[in-house]
Amino acid sequence: MTINYQFGDVDAHGAMIRAQAGLLEAEHQAIVRDVLAAGDFWGGAGSVACQEFITQLGRNFQVIYEQANAHGQKVQAAGNNMAQTDSAVGSSWA
């Protein structure tokens, strides 16, 4: 009986998570542009309220990016570790 694991799929999933984390920067910039375009709501684009919102938004996106990137790295590492273990166990049974 042969069991086939798709370790490449695990690595690809981790890479996809990391790529999506990278795409967050474009979304962040788009939101900042929208906030600045609606600057009147905040009392002007240069107002303290507007700048504080943009600063907090940046912090939130940074946390999300860091966590998603770290999770993607962990998924890739887990896939790599499983592949290495599977290879080592498989070769010991040969």
Swiss-Prot record:
Source domain of life: Bacteria
Entry's Gene Ontology cellular component terms: extracellular region; peptidoglycan-based cell wall; plasma membrane
Xref: InterPro entries: ESAT-6-like_Myco (IPR009416), ESAT-6-like_sf (IPR036689), T7SS_ESAT-6-like (IPR010310)
Chief localization: secreted
SUPFAM superfamilies membership: EsxAB dimer-like
Record key words, sorted: Secreted, Virulence
Protein's UniProt keywords contain Metal-binding: no
Subcellular location: Secreted
Gene disruption: observed consequences: Deletion mutant does not show any difference in intracellular survival and oxidative stress responses.
Quaternary assembly: Forms a complex with EsxP.
Similarity-based family: Belongs to the WXG100 family. ESAT-6 subfamily.
Role summary: Plays an important role in mycobacterial pathogenesis in the context of innate immunity. Aids host cell invasion and intracellular bacillary persistence. Increases host oxidative stress response, leading to genomic instability and decrease in macrophage viability. Also induces autophagy and modulates the immune function of macrophages.
Protein name, per record: ESAT-6-like protein EsxO
Organism of this sequence: Mycobacterium tuberculosis (strain ATCC 25618 / H37Rv)
